[in-house]
Amino acid sequence: YKWNSHAVKKKFGDYSFSLGLVWTPSERHMVKANVGRSFRLPGANELAANGVHHGTFRHEQGDTNLKSEQGWQMDASYNLRYNGFSISVSPFVSWFSNYIFLRPTGEWSVLPHAGQIYRYTGAEALFAGTEATIDIHFLRSFNYRISGEYVYTYNCDEHIPLSFSPPFSMRNTLTWQRKQVMLYAEWQSIARQNRVDRNEDRTP
């Protein structure tokens, strides 16, 4: 019998902290800022997986040499509310000295219909992006919301994007509400993603 995984004994130690600031210059404006350091222990699957993940039906392999994930985060937000109109903008940036992620290897699995092998690995990585939302309340019972989000990822070790990077997306929502009755229509737009890892397909 061939074992797919072996016993792993690991010890991890690290620290995390966060600091935040809220400034309200008036009742219409609010500014927030946060900075922090985080760490995450690799999960059992990231350390010892070796087989088909039946949720995604791909062959995933762990790495017993993975160290804890370590990173620094900074984010801010600005909120404005004025006569039925509100806007919120939240930029952020994160830098990881050891970001743990799953990436395609280009090596084909010997397991039937499993495709290429995806392996957990660690790398220096950068994330940056923003989220924005605009709300407009009109005609007493209607509200229109448009929101968008964008995330930029970068593998600093290999100077390429990280795998599974989400594309830019927007969501439009029109809501009608009166007393306890509410109706809404929603439309979501998702852009192409051409910033992909090696051995990863672009999304149309």
Question: For the regions a protein language model found, what residue spans apply to each?
Answer:
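Residue-level detector of the transmembrane beta-barrel scaffold of outer-membrane proteins
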Residues: 18, 22, 30-32, 45-47, ...
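Hydrophobic, lipid-facing positions within transmembrane beta-strands of outer-membrane proteins
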Residues: 15-19, 62, 72-76, 87, ...
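Surface-exposed extracellular loop regions of Gram-negative outer-membrane beta-barrel proteins
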Residues: 1-9, 12-23, 27-73, 86, 134-137, 141-150, ...
